[in-house]
């Protein structure tokens, strides 16, 4: 049915204005409060999601101090001769000094056909017709040994099969070696060779051997190679070591040795005060970011700018989830203790103290003093806190994981939001029905008023006519 529209001509009343005012009043009383609540809930959810992001950032900074990372103090490896051997250390490394003699380096295997070619598009074996048996046109390589072994076979199709095609087909089939074309001539007079290089050092994965050569590939019979070899070194107090790589991380716990050349050097492992301090500063910054965010979004302010004094709630003012998360972090910070420490037992002993606003203050000089006197106690203290906060099942995980405490709060709010949206929609329909009903009632009133006016005019005319005739 088309919407009724009228202007109160018969009654002289602006009925549309009355209807509009009635509708606006109904919306103000029944819709606006729900829409205001909707906005508040959506802001709360946005703030809770942001809190989750900040908690994850805190967890990332603390994961560097967990038991899984090796403890709460960073370590550094140094070498008396980096040109022979370098060293990197994880937090789990034990302080010490190691005399190392490198006898030989691990290297990969290289293999090349002795045949040279004038162009990268030159045929690999120009004498082929393609009618030969496939086995006579196939070259096969075995790469690696034992469980790490793979076999790569390339079938040369005919005399037009180029060296570039061979390289492409080999590289498609191989995972432990790579073929390439190398110019062993000059720029003006190039001379190309096909070279196959192992991608792994050492004999276990890096050995390359040509295990089959088709009878029709006579030009590929001759070859040159440089065999793969293992690294060899000796470490004082440990003995002789042979490995298939020049990066060795399974001899000294927490330490990776990077071999560079034959020779002797001394490697030392010690606390890395600078890195530990920098990581601690990152933790303090992430922790304080959470404290400030919760404080800023937990305010209830007074608004007396209008006719009535109103309380204005910040996004987290009606949520308890943020408060409980912050309380859990503070509880862990205050309860963490270094087991076995004499002078270093709590966070205040390493320069971390709590300010009146709930943020923490960091004295880096005090941390470095603690590292000099009791590095083990520092590590145990920080590790204990990090394990309780940053690992799976820890404080942060309980809030940020799927279906964790933040998810529960957000989903509860989403349920309320959906319910309020339904209420608003239904209320809008009710108000529209009320408006339509008012329009119909006023339309009937206008019709009645119009008919009464017509009757009045007719009666007045009749009375006026009768008077004139007498």
What are these regions (language model features)?
Residues 57:
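Acidic/charged coordination and interface sites in well-structured regions
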Residues 184-187, 298-309:
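Short, glycine/acidic-rich hinge or "gate" loops at secondary-structure transitions
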Residues 295-298, 302, 432-449, 453-463:
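Structured, hydrophobic secondary-structure cores that serve as assembly/anchoring elements
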């Amino acid at each position: 049915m088309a919407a009724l529209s009228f202007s109160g001509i018969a009654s002289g009343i602006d009925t549309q204005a009355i209807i509009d005012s009635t509708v606006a009043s109904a919306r103000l009383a029944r819709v606006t409060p729900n829409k205001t609540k909707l906005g508040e809930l959506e802001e709360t959810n946005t703030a809770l999601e942001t809190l989750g992001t900040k908690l994850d950032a805190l967890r990332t900074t603390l994961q560097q101090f967990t038991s899984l990372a090796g403890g709460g103090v960073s370590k550094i490896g140094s070498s008396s001769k980096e040109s022979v051997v370098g060293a990197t250390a994880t937090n789990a490394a034990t302080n010490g000094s190691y005399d190392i003699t490198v006898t030989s380096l691990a290297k990969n295997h290289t293999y090349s056909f002795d045949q040279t070619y004038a162009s990268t598009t030159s045929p690999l074996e120009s004498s082929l017709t393609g009618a030969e048996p496939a086995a006579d046109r196939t070259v096969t390589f075995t790469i690696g040994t034992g469980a790490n072994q793979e076999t790569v076979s390339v079938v040369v199709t005919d005399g037009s099969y180029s060296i570039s095609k061979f390289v492409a087909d080999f590289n498609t089939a191989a995972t432990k070696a790579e073929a390439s074309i190398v110019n062993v001539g000059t720029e003006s007079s190039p001379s190309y060779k096909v070279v196959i290089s192992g991608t792994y050092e050492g004999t276990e994965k890096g050995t390359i051997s040509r295990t089959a050569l088709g009878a029709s590939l006579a030009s590929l019979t001759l070859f040159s190679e440089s065999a793969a070899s293992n690294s060899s070194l000796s470490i004082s107090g440990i003995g002789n070591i042979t490995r298939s790589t020049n990066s060795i991380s399974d001899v000294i716990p927490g330490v990776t040795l990077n071999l560079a050349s034959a020779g002797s050097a001394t490697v030392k492992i010690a606390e890395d005060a600078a890195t530990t301090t920098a990581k601690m500063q990152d933790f303090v910054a992430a922790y304080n970011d959470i404290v400030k965010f919760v404080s800023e979004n937990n305010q209830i302010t007074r608004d007396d700018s209008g006719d009535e004094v109103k309380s204005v709630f910040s996004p987290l003012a009606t949520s308890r989830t943020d408060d409980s998360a912050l309380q859990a972090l503070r509880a862990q910070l205050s309860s963490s203790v270094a087991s076995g420490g004499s002078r270093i037992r709590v966070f205040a002993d390493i320069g971390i103290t709590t300010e009146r606003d709930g943020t923490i203050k960091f004295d880096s000089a005090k941390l470095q003093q603690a590292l000099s006197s009791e590095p083990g106690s520092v590590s145990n203290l920080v590790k204990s806190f990090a394990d309780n906060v940053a690992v799976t099942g820890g404080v942060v995980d309980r809030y940020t994981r799927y279906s964790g405490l933040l998810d529960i709060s957000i989903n509860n709010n989403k349920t309320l939001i959906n319910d309020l949206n339904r209420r608003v929609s239904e209320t809008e329909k009710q108000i529209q029905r009320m408006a339509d009903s008012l329009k119909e009632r006023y339309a009937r009133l206008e019709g009645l008023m119009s008919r009464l006016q017509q009757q009045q005019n007719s009666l007045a005319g009749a009375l006026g006519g009768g008077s004139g005739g007498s």
